[in-house]
C-alpha cells in the first residue's frame, strides 16, 4: 500500500470507525453468531522484547530460516518456550525446513543464558509437513517433553501417513523416546490442561489410528520404567471413512473422555464418546444422539467446561418436505454420566455456517421455523409453535437489495455477494454474543 503517513493514518481511522459501527450494530442481536470479528483482525500484534531477542537469535544462529507453524488451528505458534530439563531455565524449541537435505524438517533447541538465547543443538524431524507441536510433561517427571506430529503432505485418500515423535531433553542431549504412526492423538484437554483418563493424576498419551477397512484403534499409554506402556485399548469400526474432529476433556461432571467425530458415509457421521472405566477404554452407547446426517464438530459450545456433541433436529411442520429443503436446527447434548444425555443448546446455522443463531435454552421444543413462508438460505421466520408469534426473522439480501432497502433488519454477515440480516422480538434477550470460526467476542 502506497501513500503518505497522514493518508495511511486517515485510512486506518476510517476502517476502525467502520468496524466499531458493525460491533454497535451487533449489540442489538440476540445470541446471534456471525463470522466476523473486525476489531481483533485489525489489532497490530506487538512483540515482547524477549520474543524479539529470541527471533533475532534464531535468524543469527540458524540463518534466515522461517520457523514452521504447525497445521494446528488450536495453537499454530511456531516457537515454544518452557523448562525442558527442570534446571529453572527456559529452553525454546522450533522446527524449520531443510529442503535440500535428506531430512526435510529439522528442529532446534535454544537455551536462555543470562538473557541471551544460545542454540544448544539441532535434531531430526520427519516427513515434509509439521502437523502438530506441543510441550507437555508426558514422562511425568516434572519436565516438559517435545511432542511433534509430522506427515508426508500427501492429501490423497489413505495417502497421508502421519508420524508422532516424543523427544526428551536431559543432560544436555535430546533423545527420541517414542515414535508411532497416528491419525490423531491426545496429550491434553481442550483447555491445554492435563489429560488423565484413568484418574491416577498422571498424564496420558492416546493414539487414534485409522487404516480404512483394516483397523480403527484407540490406545492409551503412560510412561513408566523408561518406556510408554499401553494402559487401555479399544477397536472402533474400521469401515469409517475418516476422522474429522477430535476433542478431549470433561465429558460429564468429574469424568474425562475423548470425543472422536468420525465420517462413516458421504453425508453421515457419528461422535464416538470414549471414557475409561476400571482400566478399560469403552465407547458410550449413545448412538441415538451421536449418529447424524451432518458434519458437526463436538466441543464445549456453552462454555460450562464440559464437552457436547451435536445432532440435527427437524423443526416441527417440516416432516413431509424433501430433506434438502429443511432448515434444520443443530441441538447439542452432554453425557449425563450414566446412560443418558442432557440437552444443552440449540442453534440454527445456514448452509455455509456463516451465521449461528442460538435459541434460548428455555425455548427448546417451543420454537419452530414457519414452513408456510420460510425457505432455507433465503428467508426464515422463527415462531412459537403454540401461538404462531414471530420471535425472529433471518433474511438473505443481495448487496443491491440491502443498499436499496434493508427492511429494518440488522446486519449479521456480509460478503461481496450478499448480506444476512436479522430481526428479533423481546423473547430473545440481547446477550450480544458474536461467535464464529475465528473465535468468540463478547460485546457489552
Whereabouts are the PLM-identified features?
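A short acidic-to-branched-hydrophobic micro-motif
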Residues: 384-400
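Beta-propeller-forming repeat regions
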Residues: 27, 31-382, 399-426, 433-444
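Charge-rich, low-complexity amphipathic helices
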Residues: 5, 380-386
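N-terminal secretory signal peptides that target proteins for export/translocation
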Residues: 1-11
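Sec-dependent N-terminal signal peptides of Gram-positive bacterial secreted proteins and lipoproteins
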Residues: 11-37
Amino acid at each position: 500500500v502506497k501513500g503518505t503517513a497522514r493518508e495511511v493514518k486517515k485510512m486506518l481511522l476510517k476502517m476502525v470507525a467502520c468496524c466499531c459501527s458493525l460491533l454497535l450494530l451487533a449489540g442489538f442481536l440476540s445470541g446471534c453468531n456471525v463470522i466476523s470479528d473486525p476489531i481483533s483482525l485489525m489489532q497490530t500484534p506487538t512483540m515482547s522484547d524477549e520474543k524479539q531477542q529470541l527471533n533475532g537469535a534464531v535468524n543469527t544462529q540458524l540463518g534466515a530460516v522461517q520457523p514452521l507453524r504447525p497445521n494446528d488451528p488450536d495453537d499454530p505458534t511456531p516457537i515454544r518456550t518452557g523448562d525442558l530439563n527442570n534446571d529453572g531455565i527456559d529452553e525454546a524449541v522450533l522446527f524449520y525446513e531443510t529442503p535440500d537435505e535428506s531430512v526435510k524438517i529439522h528442529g532446534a533447541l535454544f537455551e536462555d543464558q543470562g538473557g541471551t538465547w544460545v542454540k544448544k543443538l539441532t535434531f531430526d524431524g520427519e516427513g515434509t509437513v509439521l502437523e502438530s507441536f506441543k510441550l507437555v510433561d508426558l514422562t511425568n517427571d516434572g519436565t516438559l517433553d517435545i511432542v511433534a506430529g509430522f506427515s508426508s503432505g500427501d492429501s490423497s485418500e489413505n495417502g497421508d501417513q502421519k508420524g508422532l515423535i516424543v523427544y526428551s531433553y536431559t543432560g544436555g542431549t535430546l533423545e527420541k523416546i517414542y515414535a508411532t504412526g497416528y491419525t490423531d492423538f491426545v496429550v491434553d484437554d481442550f483447555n491445554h490442561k492435563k489429560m488423565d483418563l484413568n484418574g491416577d493424576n498422571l498424564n496420558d498419551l492416546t493414539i487414534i489410528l485409522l487404516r480404512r477397512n483394516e483397523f480403527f484403534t484407540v490406545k492409551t499409554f503412560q510412561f513408566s520404567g523408561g518406556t510408554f506402556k499401553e494402559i487401555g485399548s479399544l477397536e472402533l469400526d474400521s469401515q469409517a471413512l475418516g476422522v474429522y474432529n477430535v476433542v478431549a476433556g470433561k465429558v460429564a461432571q468429574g469424568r474425562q473422555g475423548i470425543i472422536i467425530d468420525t465420517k462413516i458415509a458421504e453425508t453421515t457421521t457419528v461422535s464416538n464418546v470414549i471414557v475409561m472405566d476400571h482400566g478399560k477404554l469403552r465407547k458410550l452407547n449413545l448412538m441415538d444422539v451421536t449418529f447424524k446426517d451432518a458434519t458437526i464438530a463436538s466441543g464445549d459450545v456453552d462454555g460450562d467446561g464440559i464437552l457436547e456433541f451435536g445432532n440435527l433436529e427437524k423443526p416441527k411442520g417440516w416432516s413431509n418436505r424433501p430433506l434438502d429443503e429443511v432448515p434444520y436446527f443443530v441441538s447439542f447434548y452432554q453425557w449425563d454420566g450414566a446412560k443418558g444425555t442432557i440437552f444443552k443448546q440449540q442453534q440454527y446455522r445456514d448452509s455455509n455456517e456463516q451465521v449461528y443463531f442460538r435459541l434460548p435454552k428455555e425455548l427448546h421444543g417451543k420454537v419452530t421455523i414457519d414452513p408456510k413462508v420460510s425457505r432455507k438460505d433465503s428467508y426464515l421466520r422463527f415462531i412459537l409453535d403454540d401461538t404462531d408469534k414471530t420471535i425472529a426473522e433471518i433474511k438473505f439480501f443481495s448487496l443491491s437489495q440491502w443498499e436499496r432497502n434493508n427492511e429494518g433488519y440488522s446486519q449479521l454477515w456480509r460478503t461481496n455477494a450478499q448480506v444476512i440480516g436479522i430481526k428479533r422480538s423481546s423473547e430473545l434477550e440481547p446477550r450480544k454474543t458474536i461467535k464464529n470460526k475465528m473465535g468468540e467476542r463478547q460485546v457489552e
